[in-house]
């Protein structure tokens, strides 16, 4: 194990230990190691400083650094846990953890609630849902008439806004998602597909596993 720790210490210098991150998330050590390779690739795409800025994040998601997108901005802001305008490796892994198949339903519901609550008011309001819906439709290259979008919004708030105060609180959102689990399809990160399939099934061979065998 000494050889691994010596090499790992050099490889991950300045970043959180993969074994520690694996113990705090649903990822295995091998998966964290693969995520580190991914992190290095993204964080050096514009400025090689060991951190992911918004431009690099945008480039990784949409292969374009010029395209402004509400969805990408919201995901970046939620990954930027320390609110420094950049994402370090620890935050990258912990943020991706919510998209892991073994992540709890409660965590996924909480993430999607915060994703839609763009103004951080503790409520999801109609305009926020509309903005996100339009952004997602744009990314999937789908077009809906304004009337259709308004019908979707009407139906959403009719079903989710139980107390009819014009906004959806955390409990209402949780109940709504539990009745409509398809809403969590966003948690498969379809718009991060190019990132998450860079290393299919995390095929990198872990040095920890190698030592263990």
Curated annotation (Swiss-Prot):
Tissue specificity as recorded in UniProt = Preferentially expressed in stems, roots and siliques. Coexpressed with CIPK15/PKS3 in guard cells. Co-localized with CIPK23 in root tips and vascular bundles in the stem and the leaf, as well as in guard cells.
Query: Domain EF-hand, which positions?
Result: 31-66, 67-102, 104-139, 148-183
Explain what induces or represses this protein's expression.
By light, drought, salt, cold and wounding. Up-regulated by glucose, but not by sucrose or fructose.
- Lipidation positions, renumbered (S-palmitoyl cysteine): 3
Please tell me where this protein is predominantly located. Answer: membrane
Keyword annotations from UniProtKB, A to Z: Abscisic acid signaling pathway, Calcium, Cell membrane, Lipoprotein, Membrane, Metal-binding, Myristate, Palmitate, Phosphoprotein, Repeat, Stress response
Q: Note the superkingdom of the native organism.
A: Eukaryota
Residues carrying the lipid (S-stearoyl cysteine) are 3
Which residues are Ca(2+) 2-binding? 161, 163, 165, 167, 172
Q: Name one GO molecular function term.
A: kinase binding
Xref: Pfam families: EF-hand_7
Task: Explain what the record says happens when changing residue 2 to A.
Answer: Cytoplasmic and nucleoplasmic distribution and loss of function
Q: Which InterPro entries match?
A: CNBL1-10, EF-hand-dom_pair, EF_Hand_1_Ca_BS, EF_hand_dom
The family line of this record is:
Belongs to the calcineurin regulatory subunit family.
* Name this polypeptide is given: Calcineurin B-like protein 1
Lineage, uppermost ranks: Eukaryota, Viridiplantae, Streptophyta, Embryophyta, Tracheophyta
